[in-house]
């Protein structure tokens, strides 16, 4: 399983739309009101014999929702689901809401050995 697949598997039971990097929509298509995107930076971890045996990913999951909607249960469900994964740490939650909508960033570390992601 890739790290992308693992993140999507954890998030989609709570927020059904979850994509890496950016949610793209076609011309005239209305994006969902609630969705998640995610991104991460990768660092070598568990270095020995001139090789990295693990990867540490600094992950950000972005949760978007309409303004003035109660999102506390969803945010805590996301936090708890992420924390329940053995390779993931308990995330912090940063409020990045602006006038266009609610935006919460769940930041955590993921440490493991994942399959490579095909970016083509």
Regions found by a protein language model. Give the residues of each.
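Small/polar-rich, solvent-exposed N-terminal microdomains that initiate assembly or binding
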Residues: 1-49, 69, 74
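Broad gene-expression machinery/nucleic-acid interaction feature
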Residues: 33-35, 58-60, 103-105
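Short beta-strand and beta-hairpin "edge-sheet" elements
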Residues: 77-91, 96
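Short, charged interaction patches at domain edges and termini
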Residues: 1-10, 41-56, 90-120
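Mid-chain, well-packed structural core segment of small domains
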Residues: 55-83
